[in-house]
């Protein structure tokens, strides 16, 4: 009976450890996904800001040219 208890305790202990390791790996994988999403979001925000700045610059140039031609001061 003592040998059976020892074996069951060993199986339970090893199962608990392997389950714990699997959960740690799963949590690590989920964390990597969150970091990637944050990096992508940061990259998209940077690109949007760059596009907005470029758009403003182009529009300002077009407006200056149009006002110059309308006022005939070019």
Curated annotation (Swiss-Prot):
InterPro entries associated with the record: Antimicrobial_frog_2, Frog_antimicrobial_propeptide
Protein name: Pelophylaxin-3
Transmembrane segment boundaries: none
Entry similarity comment: Belongs to the frog skin active peptide (FSAP) family. Brevinin subfamily.
Tissue: Expressed by the skin glands.
Residue pairs linked by disulfide bridges in the UniProt entry: 68-74
Signal peptide: 1-22
Protein purpose: Antimicrobial peptide.
GO CC, one annotated term: extracellular region
GO biological process assignments: defense response
Propeptide: 23-39
Keywords linked to the UniProt accession: Amphibian defense peptide, Antimicrobial, Cleavage on pair of basic residues, Disulfide bond, Secreted, Signal
Lineage, highest ranks first: Eukaryota, Metazoa, Chordata, Craniata, Vertebrata
Keyword Signal: yes
Subcellular location: Secreted
